[in-house]
Structures are given as C-alpha cells and as structure tokens.
Amino acid sequence: MTAFEEFGVLPELGMATDELDWTLPTDVQAEAIPLILGGGDVLMAAETGSGKTGAFCLPILQIVWETLRDLEEGKAGKGGAIGGAVTPWTMSFFDRGNALAVTPDGLRCQSREFKEWHGCRATTGVRGKGKFYFEATVTDEGLCRVGWSTQQANLDLGTCRMGFGFGGTGKKSNNRQFDDYGEAFGKADVIGCLLDLKNQEVSFTKNGQNLGVAFRLPDNLAKETFYPAVVLKNAEMQFNFGKTDFKYAPGNGFVGACQAGPEHSKANPITGPAAGAPSAKPAPNAPQAIIMEPSRELAEQTYNQIEKFKYHLSNPEVRSLLLIGGVRLEEQKAQLMQGTHIVVGTPGRLEEMINSGLVLLTHCRFFVLDEADALLKQGYTELIDRLHKQIPKITSDGRRLQMVVCSATLHAFEVKKMAERLMHFPTWVDLKGEDAVPETVHHVVCLVDPQMDTTWQSLRQPIGTDGVHDRDNVHPGNHSKETLSQAVKLLKGEYCVHAIDKHNMDRAIIFCRTKQDCDNLERFLRQRGGKHYSCVCLHGDRKPQERKENLEMFKRQQVKFLICTDVAARGLDITGLPFMINVTLPDDKTNYVHRIGRVGRAERMGLAISLVATVPEKVWYHGEWCKSRGRSCNNTNLTEVRGCCIWYNEPNLLAEVEDHLNITIQQVDKTMDVPVNDFDGKVVYGQKNLRTGSGYEDHVEQLVPTVRKLTELELQSQSLFLKRLKV
C-alpha cells in the first residue's frame, strides 16, 4: 500500500504517484485530498511546486471514475434521477435555487438557508383543460410555500404574476400580494394543490379539508403550462404526484398530475438536455469537472498531470480534454463529442465553448479555480460568477457541487470575498502563511545608479529599449529625468549580462516587466553570444505553439535562459532552477516572493538577483483608455493626461518588499560579488545544501533521560494497576 492509499486514494492512482517518485504526500496533499474525497469545498494555499495540482487532481479523478463505474453498473440514480435522465414528475435538479437540494428520487426538497428563499419547479407540467392534483407534505419545520407556476415565473413562488402559492403562515400569494387564506400549516401537514384548467381556478386543501378557491387564472395564462412549484426557507417538503396512493384523494374529477396524458403534459425545458432520455448517462459534452487556469502553460501543466495520474485507471476510462487558445475549435469540438469527463482550460476558450453550447454544465460536479488570485486580477470575476450560477448546485445523482480554489494569497480581499459569495462552508488549508524567503534562497539587490556608473554613455552595442524616450532630448551630459531613465534601461541590459557571466549561470529564469522588455532582452542576449546566452521568451504575444515549444526547450535544458513576464510564468513548476534575475522589481510585493521562490526548491540552493534603479524610470502603462492596449502605441504622455506612461519608482517598491518581509535585503555592487554566509563558506547553486539540518540528532540525545524516566513511570503505573486488579 502506498502512502496515498492511506487517505482512501484508489490503488491505481497510488501506483501512478509511486511511478512519479511521490513517496510521501506533501503537506497540502495530506490536508486537501481527504477533504475533497469527503465532499467538502476547499480553499488551499501553498507555494508553487508544493503539490497543489496533485492535491485536487487525485481526488477529482477518483470521484469521477467511481461515478462512471456506478453508472455502468447501474448502481447510481435508482429512482430515475441520474445523469439528467429524470423520470417525468419529479422535482427538477436543474430548475431550482442555489441553496435548495433535491433528493436522488426527485420527490423531496430541502433548503437550509436561513435568510433567503430558494425555490424549485417540477420536471413536468400540465396544460389543456384537465383537473390536476398533487400533495406536498411538510417533513421539517421551517417556512414554505407551495403551488403552481409557469416556466417563466420567478422561483420565489408567488412574487410574480405567473406564480400562485399557499404559505405556511396562512397566506396565499401572487405578484407579491399576500392575502389571508385558509389556515396556517406546519410539520406533518399534507397540503393538496388543485389546478382546474377548465374553470381556470387554483385551490388548496389541508389534511384533506378543502380551503376553497384561492386564485382565478387570468385569461392570458390560459394556454400556459403550469408546473408544481415550491419555495423554502430552512424547511423540507415531500411530494407525491400520484405514483403512489394519495393520503387524501381529491375526488371531484381531479387526477394525479402524473396521470396527465401526453396531450396534457409538457417537459420542463430547464430540466437539462438529456431529460426524458432512456439512457442514464450524461451527454458526451457534459463534463463532471471544470478546471480553470489563468494561462495556457498552466492549463497544459495540469492536463499533463491528470494524464499521468489516470494512466492505470480503466474500465471505465476517464477522458480529459484541454481547452486552450491556439488550437482549432473543430479539433477540440470533435474530441469533446467523443466523451469528456474532465475539462482543463483557460477562461477565454472555456467561455467561448460554454456560451456556444458546446460544453454543457448540466452534470458538472467539480468547479476548480487554480491560481484564483491571478484569475481575479485578470478580470475574470464576472465570468466565474456567471459559470457558478449556471452550474447546478446539486448534481443529478443528489451530490452537492464541490468548489476547489487554489491561490498563492488566500487572504487577499478579492479571494475572501469570492469564497464568501460562491463557496459552501469551505475548509481553509493555508500552509503558506505569511510571505517569507526560504532558507535555501540567497536574494540580493544590485543598485543601478546611472549617475555613479556612467558606462552607459559609451556602450558599443547597447540593448534596444522600449522607445519611451524616442522623442525626448536624451544624451550624455544632459542630466534630465528622461536621460537618467534611458540610462537605467541601458545599464540594466549590461548588468544582466554581467550577473550571468559572474556566476557562470547556465540555467536561469529572467523576469521583465513588459512583453516588449522581454523581446528586447532576448534580442540583446542573442546578439551578445549565441549559445553562451541561448534564450527563449514566454509571454502572451507569442503564438501558442511557440510558447509551448519555448517552455519545453527550457525544461529540457536546450536553452539556458527563460525570459518571461509574471503572468506567463504564473504557477509553472520548473525544478532544479539555480538562478533568477529580476530586471525590474514587480509592482506587487507578493510577486517578489513568488519570483524568488522559483529557485531554492527541493532543498537546493538558489540565487535571486534584483536590479533596482536608484532613479525613477519612465515606463509604459497602457490602461483601458488605450485603444490598442499597447500594440504600436506611441503616446508617451503620463497617465494623468490620458497618456500611456508612468514614472516607475523602484526604491519605493524595494522599501515595500522589505517592509512586507520584515527584513533588509542585502545589496551588492555592479561586480555582483555575493557574500556567502554559509558554514563552510561554499555554496553551489542548484545543488543541495547539506548543512540545512535542524540539530535533530542533538535534540534526541537531550530527550533520552526524559523518555527513560517516562518509561519507568509507565511501567510502575501499569504494575500498580495489575496488582490492585488481582486484589
């Protein structure tokens, strides 16, 4: 038995983890896997590379596989409520409120929401000129209202013109008009709901006693279909549409609703695409899990992990699909229609496929947001809310929708707000805590001062800059802000090369602020030395196939340097990385920790160097007012006057980082000599630091006398107990 199997993970999944050399679960996996397998919503935060992907992929794969197996064996959905193939005359799993649950047989509704009303309609309605009846029994205390409504009516029964309800407080309601009617009812009472379409009357009974006509239907609703409906607030009701004997038979020509023939009944259009179908299986394009990633690289990374994990899962086969831009839509559509159970995708392509009806959300059981803070910062809050609203909160086999959120910063206001709004009593798994720099990372700052270092004035092959100062009067001898800003850009290219040479960097990730900066540095390094400075770029303006190939080349160590932006590199797990260079500090202090955390993993030593300008640097900042959003933009005015530039103040950003980490970051000069404060004075970046122990052996020796004394006391106490037992 593998360590993962002790959490209840399938042996087939355990074999896959074993083959990946995952001997023991990481902390986040040990916490999250049992919680997800147990059916709960989970919020988890841990560093990139800590196994977050496995923490949600393994349990989701297991539950999806078990559901498919039960479908094949016919174990699930007895009572006709699996996979959207609902038997006529049950309460709908789809046409209902967010916090209302429907049992697998479709005949009992429950809502435990104290503050809001949540409603539900039946899967089938009646029409024509007949007289129809159903019973609703109050099975738990709470507030409830039951009756009839059209398909266009508000789920909050009785609050619009097309809903007619009778509530437990003894009030009838239509169009928000609440009038005294009959008498109050409560737990164990049986309410009969009568609809006379011939005379266009709605009436109710309580425990067999007719309470009289409650409503007369307006003529404009004469041709409408009416569905049994209920709305609950912390209450529960059981329904009988006539499949079994009524407790109080209606008489007077009324028949059970389920006895309405085809000419007098109509299926609820919101019951789902497979409603009434003979097959219990969901549609091939109705996945059970949706995993949203902020970038195509992360989506590919997660998809590849799922493919590895499910290698030994068979009979039935779990099919996963990657939905990202840059791939032909027809190709993805063809794969989707072959049957898909887990979808991993980026927001843009997911939205396109869902809005066009190619991906159905009717059977979605898991909604996963990976790197949620990045998704929210990219402006996908509205999309996430909309998708969550579309996904049924109770699946067709009676299981509750599970939401899993992974974020580097769980305590960010936006993430907290989203969790409160969308998640159901989530468990917080925060193994990250406050931002801190790992002991295995040396991080230093190299100040770039164009007033002290004037070598920028005589560079033979300077780096190409972003063009911010193309129309400014910048030249040596002119000490204007613009000239010093341009000098910073030139010096940073030189300092980057010098850092590479000084530390013989053969593998590093280099962060630039913008896509244009990445392109400029890539050209500069290639001009300086071919193979010696071999590099590739990773950012949103590169074609998807190129981005994929560039990342693979860097992972396979075919090139030495990966130049990228924060967004493109978010969440990428690149192992054994010894060096990282910040050409420009990030404007978000938490991103500094994310960047330098890419080195020094798996107990291997890493060096992070940040180039920080001592003077303000003028940089591009394309806001919503920029029509091209940066493409061929030449508006170098400041944003205060609707321009596309700002003055970037790195000393202030450095102060924010130091305050955030509560440390003073060590500074080095342009020679890039990094002081080593290790025990033996030697560090090889990228190799394990053998002296990072915690003194555990000494600690054991200190505890030996105490443990020995404890053993003696335990022996004495048990001996005393046995002696007294004999007496």
From Swiss-Prot:
UniProt motif (DEAD box) ranges:
370-373
Q: Name one GO molecular function term.
A: ATP binding
PROSITE patterns tied to this protein: B302_SPRY, HELICASE_ATP_BIND_1, HELICASE_CTER, Q_MOTIF
Query: One Pfam family for this entry, by name?
Result: Helicase_C
- Please, which domain of life does this record's source organism belong to? Eukaryota
Q: Where is the Helicase ATP-binding domain?
A: 2-428
Report the residue ranges that make up the B30.2/SPRY domain in this protein.
Answer: 69-246
SUPFAM superfamilies reported in the protein's UniProt record:
Concanavalin A-like lectins/glucanases (SSF49899), P-loop containing nucleoside triphosphate hydrolases (SSF52540)
Ranges for domain Helicase C-terminal come to 483-676
Task: List the InterPro entries.
Answer: B30.2/SPRY (IPR001870), B30.2/SPRY_sf (IPR043136), ConA-like_dom_sf (IPR013320), DEAD/DEAH_box_helicase_dom (IPR011545), Helicase_ATP-bd (IPR014001), Helicase_C-like (IPR001650), P-loop_NTPase (IPR027417), SPRY_dom (IPR003877)
A Gene Ontology term for the protein's cellular component: nucleus
Would the keyword Hydrolase be found if you checked this record's keyword annotation?
yes
Answer yes or no on keyword Transmembrane: no
Task: Write out the catalysed reaction.
Answer: ATP + H2O = ADP + phosphate + H(+)
SMART domains hit by this protein: DEXDc, HELICc, SPRY
EC number(s) on file: 3.6.4.13
GO biological process terms on file? double-strand break repair; embryonic development via the syncytial blastoderm; oogenesis; spermatogenesis; tRNA processing
Keywords from the UniProt entry = ATP-binding, Exonuclease, Helicase, Hydrolase, Nuclease, Nucleotide-binding, RNA-binding
Task: Detail which positions bind ATP.
Answer: 46-53
What is the documented function of this protein? Acts as an ATP-dependent RNA helicase, able to unwind both RNA-RNA and RNA-DNA duplexes. Possesses 5' single-stranded RNA overhang nuclease activity.
The similarity annotation says: Belongs to the DEAD box helicase family. DDX1 subfamily.
> What is the recorded name of this protein?
ATP-dependent RNA helicase Ddx1
What are the leading ranks of the lineage? Eukaryota, Metazoa, Ecdysozoa, Arthropoda, Hexapoda
